[in-house]
Design a protein with these regions (language model features):
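A gly/proline- and charged-residue-enriched helix-loop-helix capping module
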Residues: 156-172
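N-terminal secretory/targeting leader peptides
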Residues: 10, 15-159, 178, 182-402
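Short secondary-structure capping/junction motifs at helix and strand boundaries
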Residues: 171-173, 182-183
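N-terminal amphipathic/basic-hydrophobic helices that include classical n-h-c signal peptides
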Residues: 1-12
Length: 402
């Protein structure tokens, strides 16, 4: 295809010698032919300065007019591993959408605090929030079942499978939209590792050590620690270290070795009690304003969903990498990491039974969600227990490195 003197395009067939034709096909192949066809088709594209189509134009580059921007605030400080996951999720969406959907990713407290973020999403002050439901459990204690408690023996992945394939998403959305009248849609991803019992001045040797202790935790976990005698005080993650340092609280839990270092917990407490049932595998939560979600084109909705799924796997892998590195850093700086006694774990399970009984009395949505989780656990746990070697597996590890 060439331009004539009149400015019109016309196709001219040029016969190449046999050897040249073979070389053309050998070294250019389908990609060159595809580029040739694209160049031909582009002759019909609008001239420079013409309005771009809503799809973002040729090559997937979105014009400003076709770009949708969401303002989403996280519950994490800029140096937190969860903020890294938030930014990776944002990048996945922007890359897969060709820039048609952009995320203005804001760290914690930029527009509002963590407990009020869900209201800001509902009202449209924020288009979304990246957090955990324990931060807004004051709305309805049932939402904290999404990641609090002993998980009925399931792994985080098994629990997340309940959310996506066992009816959990519909139950949660029903609570948020019908019961709480919140204009919000929710997505859960990235099952976390078991969170430590907490950071303490002294080693915890039994459940009685919690009696009279001023302790920081969130969500339904408050009932577990209160059941062991602690006085639970709500403190935002960014203020935990300073609250410990000033004596406002005696001990605290936050999340994982990487986040705990980021928030300065090992600077004020040198004993970390590992293993706990209070949050055996919490799950990250993306909350989106429903009006903005419903207005999003279907292909962009799919991109958000599948970026969440992809971010789930990547987040788990990132956690394994960074948490293990930071575990060693804690040991190297002299932090004592001590296994929680079985007597404390047993006391947590007993306290959880009390929490469940109390919450089930007058909250039918709590009962519905818990029953659904139980039914899922009764199906998947026996299968997983019969088929899988538990991991991590100390037996094969010791055999390999004896």
């Amino acid at each position: 295809m060439v331009a004539t003197r009149s400015g019109k395009w016309e196709v001219r067939i040029v016969k190449l010698p046999t050897s040249s034709r073979r070389g053309f096909l050998k070294y250019t192949g389908l990609s060159a032919l595809g580029a040739f066809v694209t160049a031909c088709l582009s002759s019909n594209a609008p001239a420079a300065g013409s309005p771009s189509p809503s799809t973002g134009g040729v090559g997937g580059i979105a014009s400003p007019a076709s770009t949708i921007t969401w303002k989403i605030q996280s519950g994490w400080a800029g140096n937190d591993i969860f903020q890294e996951m938030f930014l990776e999720w944002k990048q996945m969406i922007e890359d897969m959408s060709g820039g048609r959907l952009k995320i203005d990713a804001l760290p914690v407290n930029t527009i509002t605090n963590t407990s009020d973020a869900i209201d800001a999403v509902h009202s449209g002050t924020l288009d979304g929030a990246h957090h955990v439901p324990a931060y807004y459990y004051g709305k309805d204690h049932a939402v904290s079942l999404m990641g609090t408690g002993p998980m009925m023996g399931m792994s985080g992945d098994m629990w997340l499978a309940w959310y996506w394939y066992g009816g959990g998403q519909a139950i949660f959305d029903d609570i948020m939209q019908r019961k709480l009248k919140l204009n919000v849609v929710s997505f859960f991803y990235m099952p976390m590792q078991t969170q430590p019992l907490g950071w303490f001045k002294n080693e915890i040797k039994g459940p009685d050590d919690f009696k009279g202790m001023k302790f920081r935790t969130v969500g339904l976990a408050t009932g577990i620690y209160e059941g062991m005698g602690a006085s639970v005080i709500s403190v935002p993650g960014s203020q935990v270290a300073s609250s410990l340092d000033r004596g406002l609280i005696d001990a605290a839990e936050f999340n994982n070795t990487t986040s705990d270092i980021a928030y300065g917990l090992p600077d004020v407490r040198q004993i970390l009690m590992a293993k706990s049932y209070h949050q055996a595998s919490e799950i990250l939560n993306v909350s989106i304003n429903k009006t903005k979600w419903d207005a999003l084109p279907k292909d962009l909705q799919a991109i958000v969903k599948y970026a969440t799924w992809a971010g789930s796997g990547s987040g788990v892998w990132r956690s394994i990498d960074e948490n293990s590195r930071d575990y060693k850093k804690l040991l190297d700086r002299g932090i004592k990491i001590i296994k929680t006694p079985q007597s404390v774990l047993d006391a947590q399970l007993k306290a959880w039974d009390t929490v469940v009984a109390k919450e089930s009395k007058d909250n039918p949505e709590f009962v519905k969600m818990l029953d659904s989780q139980r039914q899922w656990a009764q199906r998947v746990f026996p299968w997983a227990d019969a088929i899988n070697i538990p991991t991590p597996d100390p037996v094969s590890y010791k055999a390999m490195f004896k």
